[in-house]
Amino acid sequence: MTDTRNLTQLGSKTQAPASPEAATLETAPFSRGDGPAAIVRFTCPEFTSLCPVTGQPDFAHIVIDYAPDKLLVESKSLKLFLTSFRNHGAFHEDCTVMIGRRIVEATKPLWLRIGGYWYPRGGIPIDVFWQTGTPPKDAWVPETGVPPYRGRG
């Protein structure tokens, strides 16, 4: 049975953190066993942050793939972490990379990649990609399934 004693957010009424810096990513133990590494995917199709200059909302479809080693990121804490960006002002690139780095810091995975598919602002969609290296050998890493942005063209 998984040891959940260190989880404080799961199963509790929890306020959304005021900022990404105030958010806590919690982890649970993972036994990966023998064979190819497992790949875990989180998809956040309605991610929101604020433009650091205008304060206007920015929206993205975020896809996170990682190969856990000994720790899993607990999904409620991840949800609260992602929600904490709602009132956070940062550029698309900064938000995307910050998310990836925080998960790496918390879980120390074998591998992680994140894709931030940002909806157009000023007529330009911005896609941001970051990863820690090459995927583990023989791991099944499916395509993200996010099509390139197409307007009415």
Curated annotation (Swiss-Prot):
Binding-site list for substrate: 73-75, 92-93
UniProt record similarity statement: Belongs to the GTP cyclohydrolase I family. QueF type 1 subfamily.
Name this protein carries in UniProt: NADPH-dependent 7-cyano-7-deazaguanine reductase
Associated pathway: tRNA modification; tRNA-queuosine biosynthesis
Broad class of enzyme this protein falls into: oxidoreductase
UniProt key word Cytoplasm: yes
Pfam families per UniProt: QueF (PF14489)
EC numbers: 1.7.1.13
Places the protein is found: Cytoplasm
GO biological process, one term: queuosine biosynthetic process
GO cellular component annotations of the record: cytoplasm
List of catalytic residues: 51 (thioimide intermediate), 58 (proton donor)
Lineage start: Bacteria, Pseudomonadati, Pseudomonadota, Alphaproteobacteria, Hyphomicrobiales
